[in-house]
Swiss-Prot record:
Quaternary assembly: Monomer and homodimer. Component of the CIA complex. Interacts with CIAO1. Interacts with IREB2. Interacts with APAF1.
Gene that encodes it: CIAO2A
Family statement drawn from the similarity comment of this UniProt entry: Belongs to the MIP18 family.
Location in the cell: Cytoplasm
PANTHER family cross-referenced by the UniProt entry: CYTOSOLIC IRON-SULFUR ASSEMBLY COMPONENT 2A, CYTOSOLIC IRON-SULFUR ASSEMBLY COMPONENT 2B-RELATED
Chain residues that bind Zn(2+) 2: H89, H123, E150, E153
Functional summary from the UniProt entry: Component of the cytosolic iron-sulfur protein assembly (CIA) complex, a multiprotein complex that mediates the incorporation of iron-sulfur cluster into extramitochondrial Fe/S proteins. As a CIA complex component and in collaboration with CIAO1 specifically matures ACO1 and stabilizes IREB2, connecting cytosolic iron-sulfur protein maturation with cellular iron regulation. May play a role in chromosome segregation through establishment of sister chromatid cohesion. May induce apoptosis in collaboration with APAF1.
UniProtKB keywords: Chromosome partition, Cytoplasm, Metal-binding, Zinc
GO biological process: chromosome segregation; protein maturation
GO cellular component: cytosolic [4Fe-4S] assembly targeting complex
UniProt-recorded name of the protein: Cytosolic iron-sulfur assembly component 2A
InterPro entries recorded: FSCA_dom_sf, MIP18, MIP18-like
Keyword Cytoplasm among UniProt keywords: yes
Gene Ontology MF: a single term: metal ion binding
Length: 160
């Protein structure tokens, strides 16, 4: 019986080691990513919709599950947002994506790469909009437009 117990213990520890689960910090990593995802969500949930008096959270444009954070290396993270416009023909989906990007670029306290997408199948021109909101030059050009910049600033303004 003692041999079986020893063999079982060795097999289990070997399995954990091979799967990477016994490395120091490996059990912590999913929790850290979850905490970072909640941190991101807390920043974006209060963004105001450009045409309604509601937040993106209230309209369910963003939810906790739409935020994913992956570790690139020890100090850098990939933040992926998949938001859902209220209607498939939403004319302001690009502006919402711009607001998400601006808010996170300004407020995230850790180094990150940001990817923002419209949830698959939720907008009639999602592919085009995804390209626009992930193109640094287009984002910079949009923020140079004083009218657009003013709208974005109003949307990302923190509530009192």
């Amino acid at each position: 019986m003692e041999r079986v117990s020893g063999l079982l213990s060795w097999t289990l520890s070997r399995f954990l080691w091979l799967s990477g689960l016994s490395e120091p910090g490996a059990a912590r990593q999913p929790r850290i990513m979850e905490e970072k995802a909640l941190e991101v969500y807390d920043l974006i949930r209060t963004i105001r919709d450009p045409e309604k008096p509601n937040t993106l959270e209230e309209l369910e444009v963003v939810t906790e599950s739409c935020v994913e954070v992956q570790e690139i290396n020890e100090d850098d993270y990939l933040v992926i947002i998949r938001f859902t416009p209220t209607v498939p023909h939403c004319s302001l989906a690009t502006l919402i994506g711009l607001c998400l990007r601006v808010k996170l670029q300004r407020c995230l306290p850790f180094k990150h790469k940001l990817e923002i997408y419209i949830s698959e199948g939720t907008h009639s021109t999602e592919e085009d909009i995804n390209k626009q909101i992930n193109d640094k030059e287009r984002v910079a050009a949009a923020m140079e437009n004083p009218n657009l910049r003013e709208i974005v600033e109003q949307c990302v303004l923190e509530p009192d």
